[in-house]
């Protein structure tokens, strides 16, 4: 079973209840929860919640490390098989839609990241600008060039990196995919009916995070000395804005405003993915009937 939804929509609480009452085991599908030492800003389930319903694929990486959709697919397939062998139902819960898509449909055989080539691309961008690199991509791979915006350095860099490593364009390589998920899946999405309600939930949750010590959490991460804002972990919503606040780029109130706005944008992107997602059953956040609906559709 998939339980998808935007941030702050109530996925975790519903998943824990489902796991307790209906013989499920939870696998996290979240690119932020994979990181250790990042508990408050990721809204990671607390010790009491994890005691009620353990989650697979959380706290598996140091914040200095990277983790791809391919890494997730590999690890999730191992966990799914183990859960099924135990006679239980895998319940995959989260909002990282790229992970869900990779698991469901399979992935193209793209080469692993090469830090040396990536740094060469960054150095060239620092000198020539990303606009010039985008022009290079358009010449190498017009299809990818049309799809990737010049102001999207992460995807632009990856497209060039793939070509420099393999000698083939990303468009060529993405025409072949690994096998789709070899299991029947029932898919659910949970969200408030009113976007205003979701925005209120996001603001309330960030306030609670601050009360729980989020700024202190980010300060501890900064104090390690080996982390920086270009790492995937530090690009997680809230962490980047709090880091910038601690470096003196803006004041506390601006940090709160920017972090909340970034979280709203994340939720908007997640909902955009979900509205185009096939074969999904929608649930309303907080509805008392959700557990019954999950169990009925599960069959």
UniProtKB/Swiss-Prot annotation:
| Gene3D superfamilies xref list | 1.10.20.140, P-loop containing nucleotide triphosphate hydrolases (3.40.50.300)
Check the record and name the InterPro entries matching this protein. Dimethylallyltransferase, IPT, P-loop_NTPase
Q: Where is this site: Interaction with substrate tRNA?
A: 96, 118
**EC number(s) for this protein?**
2.5.1.75
Reactions accelerated catalytically: adenosine(37) in tRNA + dimethylallyl diphosphate = N(6)-dimethylallyladenosine(37) in tRNA + diphosphate
Alphabetic keyword roster: ATP-binding, Magnesium, Nucleotide-binding, Transferase, tRNA processing
For the ligand (ATP), the binding residues are: 5-12
* Cofactor(s) recorded in Swiss-Prot or TrEMBL: Mg(2+)
- Relate the protein's function as given in its record: Catalyzes the transfer of a dimethylallyl group onto the adenine at position 37 in tRNAs that read codons beginning with uridine, leading to the formation of N6-(dimethylallyl)adenosine (i(6)A).
**What assembly does the database describe for this protein?**
Monomer.
Q: Which HAMAP family match?
A: IPP_trans (MF_00185)
The UniProt similarity line reads: Belongs to the IPP transferase family.
The protein here is known as: tRNA dimethylallyltransferase
| Lineage of the organism | Bacteria, Pseudomonadati, Pseudomonadota, Gammaproteobacteria, Alteromonadales
């Amino acid at each position: 079973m998939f339980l998808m939804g935007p941030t702050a929509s109530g996925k975790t609480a519903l998943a824990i209840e489902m796991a307790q009452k209906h013989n499920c085991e939870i696998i996290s599908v979240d690119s932020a929860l994979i990181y250790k030492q990042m508990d408050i800003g990721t809204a990671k389930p607390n010790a009491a919640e994890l005691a009620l319903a353990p989650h697979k694929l959380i706290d598996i990486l140091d914040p200095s490390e990277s983790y791809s959709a391919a890494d997730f697919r590999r690890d999730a397939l191992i966990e799914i098989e183990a859960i099924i062998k135990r006679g239980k139902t895998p319940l995959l819960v989260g909002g990282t839609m790229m992970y869900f898509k990779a698991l469901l449909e399979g992935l193209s055989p793209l080469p692993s990241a090469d830090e040396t080539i990536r740094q060469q691309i960054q150095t060239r961008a620092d000198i020539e600008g990303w606009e010039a690199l985008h022009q290079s991509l358009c010449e190498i791979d017009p299809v990818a060039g049309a799809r990737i915006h010049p102001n999207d350095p992460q995807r632009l860099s990856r497209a060039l990196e793939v070509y420099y490593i393999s000698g083939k364009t990303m468009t060529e390589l993405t025409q072949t995919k690994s096998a789709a998920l070899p299991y029947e899946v029932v898919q659910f999405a949970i969200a408030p009916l009113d976007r205003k309600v979701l925005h209120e939930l996001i603001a309330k949750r960030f306030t609670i995070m601050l009360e729980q010590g989020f700024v202190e959490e980010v300060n501890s991460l900064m104090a390690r000395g080996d982390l920086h804002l270009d790492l995937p972990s530090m690009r997680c919503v809230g962490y980047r804005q709090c880091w910038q606040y601690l470096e003196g780029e803006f004041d506390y109130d601006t940090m709160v405003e920017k972090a909340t706005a970034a979280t709203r944008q994340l939720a908007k992107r997640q909902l955009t993915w979900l509205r185009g997602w096939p074969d999904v059953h929608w649930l309303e956040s907080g509805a008392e009937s959700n557990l019954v609906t999950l169990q009925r559709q599960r069959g």
